[in-house]
Amino acid sequence: MEEFQRYFELDRYQQHDFLYPLIFQEYIYALAHDHGLNRSIVLENPGYDNKSSLLIVKRLITRMYQQNHYIISSNDSNQNPFFGHNKNLYSQMISEGFVVIVEIPFSLRLRSSLEGKEIVKSQNLQSIHSIFPFLEDKFLHLNYVXDILIPYPIHLEILVQPLRHWVKDASSLHLLRFFLHEYRNWNSLITPKRPSAYFSKRNQRLFLFLYNSHVCEYESIFLLTQSSHLRSTSSGALLERIYFYGKLEHSVEVFAKDFQAILWLFKDPFIHYLRYQGKSILASKGTSLLMNKWKYYLLNCWQCHFYVWSQPRRIYINQLSNHSLDFLGYLSSVRLNPSMVRSQMIENSFLIDNAIKKFDTIVPIIPMIQSLAKAKFCNVLGHPISKPVWADLSDSDIIDRFGRICRNLSHYHSGSSKKKTLYRIKYILRLSCARTLARKHKSTVRAFLKRVGSELLEEFFTEEEQVLSLTFPRAFSTSTSRGLYRRRIWYLDIICINDLANHE
């Protein structure tokens, strides 16, 4: 973030929260473009480079200076030659630049507010995999879990309201409202199952920022008020992942009086909360009655104080020992490993049954095959097929793309307790790559593999296998190394979900 700070004239703009002048700066669009190129994705994003150039940015800024407010309207875009096949190009560029403007000054404020505070370093906490060690440590001792479907706002203005507390620039807020209503026109009305249907797939960064700020409204009340009753410090680490400290402090001052008495009635010192995508999990060591109290408290909080309609069926309460959590591409559960211990006391011996709880994570095969079939790597039954759209690429590019996808999936799902699903996914991608190359060279798969040999297989040599082979070079082929490879590996550098791991 230090490299971005020099771009901002803090005394001129940030002192009064004036963000709108930054929309006319060329480097803002360069930062947005770099973010699009550097984000971690599984599948390629073709054509992104062709849609953004310095010439288009200059013309866009010139037209904004001319106060031609029709440049990003849906009616004008059909007649504009610069749009080409993408009629909302200008609006996409401005929205991506706008979210960069909003995010970076807010991050700078966050950094200044955290100076002198002892908070766990955020590098590891930003990783998605950091959630699973937390579950391994805490969920073994809990009884009930509530799967919560976070309600979506019924009106676009609700997404703008959280920003009004710290953005005093009316022009920026009006521009944001304009984006939201334009997306609504382009993508039709919202549907109950897809709250992000307002937005095209390429503008999800703006939506995620607004959605996080909206959800943080009630999380700030729930987490910070309840954190005073928690025995562990996990809540502090969790708040690190939300990125909205300034808003949290303001919300607590406003709403603490209303909710403190209510929360005190059913405080729970063994409650844990985590949020992912449009869902959240609330786990507790308490009873079913206590979980039902939390359920109706959240419903009343959403409806009465945040004007968001929700129904009781959106919160499912289950006993943790009989329930699997389906989130972030994993099926997570707590299972009992039975064991029998023989105890000898003088002349008598006893057999004692002992059950040890174990946190288990597996990768569901059916959603993975559905994702691969949607990406045209196999059919709905899991049989590999060729990728015709990549047949025009060079052999090295085709192998590199398939190999990168395979390594990314193995990297993301390295925490699986059972590797059978990963082996099958690797087989599908490997054979799909062979079929694509055979299609390009007008040959059969058998003849092509016979000619290429084992060189094709080396591209699908996963990172975990390389690490084990370097760490245990002599024992890599023994049963000991196979046992190590079956263990879960959590990485602390994964900051986004792979497309094929997102089954929504």
Swiss-Prot record:
What is an example of a GO molecular function annotated in this UniProt entry?
A: RNA binding
Tell me, in one coarse class, where this protein mainly resides. plastid
Q: Which GO terms describe its biological process?
A: mRNA processing; RNA splicing; tRNA processing
Check the record and name the InterPro entries matching this protein. Answer: Domain_X (IPR024937), Maturase_MatK (IPR002866), Maturase_MatK_N (IPR024942)
> Does the record carry Protein transport as a key word?
no
The terms describing its cellular component in GO are: chloroplast
Q: Where in the cell is it found?
A: Plastid, Chloroplast
- Look up the domain of life of the source: Eukaryota
Matching entries from Pfam families are given as:
Intron_maturas2, MatK_N
Keyword tags: Chloroplast, mRNA processing, Plastid, RNA-binding, tRNA processing
HAMAP family (UniProt xref):
MatK
State its role.
Usually encoded in the trnK tRNA gene intron. Probably assists in splicing its own and other chloroplast group II introns.
Entry similarity comment: Belongs to the intron maturase 2 family. MatK subfamily.
Q: What is this protein called?
A: Maturase K
Taxonomic lineage is:
Eukaryota, Viridiplantae, Streptophyta, Embryophyta, Tracheophyta
